[in-house]
A protein has these predicted regions:
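Arg/Lys-rich, positively charged N-terminal/basic patches that mediate binding to nucleic acids
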Residues: 1-45, 51-53, 141-185, 194, ...
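Enriched for short, Lys/Arg-rich terminal
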Residues: 217-239
Length: 239
């Protein structure tokens, strides 16, 4: 049987320093930005020639924080509340053979004159900071878009967005408006696990250099940001 060893061609840098809060799919939070920085072996600008002709990219990447020791044929999709099982190949679960992810992102700009080689600035990401990227391909609307496609069980169990409220104290933080809007849209997706909807519990989410604390009311369909703490350690965004 043919086997092939692959290596990262680039690293994705994002504001998501931990798994909690990462959008469940790419494109759900259009403002979520990322920077694709190529490994030294692949920093030749010729490898990107013509990429600006496209608006979106397919990113093939690895779930680097998941350690799958053995093959598990059944998984519990979060969309089903963590109670029903589906075949791993019928889901987008990160706990899968080879641990590969596939995301569609928008190209914001391509930066060629950088000390780190070419950098592709993208948005709509759903990846952890430091995620290894194994391949990049242009998104082709004429062949990759299928409006008639069925969403399977996902169509019957859609995520409802929630209303995000800021307490006055949280609004006094030094968070800029762009980051504030991004955080609102991240929390509007309700990052809590379907089986963990405790009321009055204070949750914490790290985004960029900020630690955002919030409470949720599932009955009212709201998330209230109660505090924002700035912390500069562990933030790896490329300058």
């Amino acid at each position: 049987m043919y086997e092939k060893t692959i290596e990262p061609v680039a690293i994705m840098y994002t504001g998501f320093g931990e798994k909690f809060g990462i959008p469940r799919q790419s494109g759900l939070v259009p403002e979520a930005a990322g920077q694709i920085v190529f490994e030294p072996k692949y920093q030749n600008p010729d490898a990107l020639r013509g990429i600006e002709e496209f608006t979106h990219l397919w990113i093939i990447w690895g779930f680097s924080e998941n350690r799958v020791e053995k093959f598990t044929p059944l998984v519990t999709p979060p969309r089903l509340g963590g109670r029903e099982k589906r075949g791993v190949f019928a889901t987008r679960s990160p706990f899968r053979p080879n641990g590969m992810g596939l995301s569609s992102v928008r190209i914001d700009k391509v930066e060629y004159k950088s000390s780190k080689g070419p950098i592709i600035h993208v948005s709509g990401v759903d990846m952890l900071d430091g995620t290894p990227i194994y391949d990049i391909k242009p998104y082709l609307a004429y062949s990759d878009s299928h409006p008639e496609a069925s969403d399977g069980f996902a169509a019957e169990h859609r995520w409802d967005t929630v209303h995000v409220i800021w307490r006055d104290e949280a609004l006094k933080s030094c968070m800029d408006e762009g980051t504030r809007i991004t955080v609102e849209h991240i929390l509007a997706q309700d990052p809590r696990a379907a089986y963990n909807k405790a009321r009055d519990y204070i949750y914490g989410m790290r985004y960029g250099k900020f630690d955002i604390r919030f409470v949720a009311d599932s009955h009212a369909g709201t998330i209230e940001i109660v505090d924002v703490v700035e912390c500069i350690d562990g933030y790896h965004k490329v300058k």
